[in-house]
Amino acid sequence: MKKLLLMLFLIPNISFALPITLNKYISKHPSWNSSDKSSFSYITSRCGILFVVISERYKNMTGGEEIYKMALTNAVIFSKVSSDTYKEMGGKTNAFQERAKKWARIYGEEGVNNIDVYGEMIHGDVKSDVSSCMDKVMPAI
């Protein structure tokens, strides 16, 4: 019985893990911030989407005004850079929108899982991606 309860506790953590963190993606694509425009667009779009999801979480939360404003500002910056890069490469709008929907769903589910398990949205892989966006990607913009 204890093993079953342990498995039930661990399954949500496994099922909502990000397919790949930005840090891992960046390490596998070393030219992301120079010649690899496709990776640059992908990374900046994920950062933009991540911050949109965070801003929505804190939008109407008491005491969350500063986080909301910061997240929204970052979402606009990353999304604009990603969109411009994607258009520059000749990418199609519908493909860009599909990628955005996919990652909004993934980050939303991961955030809800983090709240349920840890009591906060920005934890684990989400926290790792926030750090990657701010420490690695933002300086490259």
Predicted segments, located by residue:
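Sec-dependent N-terminal signal peptides
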Residues: 3-13
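Sec/Tat signal peptide C-region and signal peptidase I cleavage site
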Residues: 13-19
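Short, charged/polar, low-complexity loop and linker segments
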Residues: 28-29
